A protein has these predicted regions:
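Alpha-helical transmembrane segments and membrane-interface helix-loop junctions
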Residues: 1-172
């Protein structure tokens, strides 16, 4: 049940990321056209909207990256066995959980700071942008906990190691 939820959530995030890329084209295109032609007036708010969308795109991409385990790795040791690899994954995952906690806690403070403020040009509540940090931290925590569970099961001898691509299809 938890895997089904995380799979659904990962798919939702992927859809949101693709949608935000498509939506980002609108304010950026308006800004370009208004800068080089007299056909439309200069829209000052488009730069701010593009920046806000870009922030969300980066955060959603980071969430998906943790789910897929697509962050970079540096191989220091030669090929290790399944249990040793799982132990190293658990150790590395602890650091990712630490960063998730920092994003969650500091992001919440960041959001509270912006709660009653609005952006200058687009007149949007700033908490809508700042809430990306705690949501990212919480999402990292959920996705990384799932990955840690898989590594713990391999370490305990209850499961075989999964290839990264198969990890995503585990709930299907």
């Amino acid at each position: 049940m938890v895997r089904a939820f995380t799979l659904w959530y990962a798919r939702l995030l992927s859809w949101l990321l693709a949608s935000s890329v498509a939506v980002l084209i609108v304010p950026v295109s308006l800004q370009i056209f208004s800068r080089y032609t007299q056909l439309i007036p200069a829209y000052i708010w488009t730069e701010e909207m593009a920046r806000f969308l870009f922030i969300w795109m980066v955060m959603i991409g980071a969430m998906i990256g943790v789910r897929e385990g697509s962050h970079f790795e540096v191989d220091v040791w030669p090929e290790l066995g399944a249990k040793a690899t799982a132990a190293l994954q658990l150790a590395a995952s602890a650091f990712i959980l630490l960063f998730a906690f920092v994003f969650l806690w500091a992001g919440w403070e960041f959001t509270r700071f912006a709660w009653n403020r609005v952006s200058e040009l687009a007149d949007l509540p700033l908490w809508m942008i700042h809430v990306a940090w705690p949501i990212t931290g919480l999402t990292w925590f959920v996705f990384q906990s799932e990955r840690m569970w898989d590594a713990a099961m391999v370490l305990a001898g209850r499961a075989q190691p999964k290839a990264e691509a198969k990890h995503l299809e585990a709930a299907e």
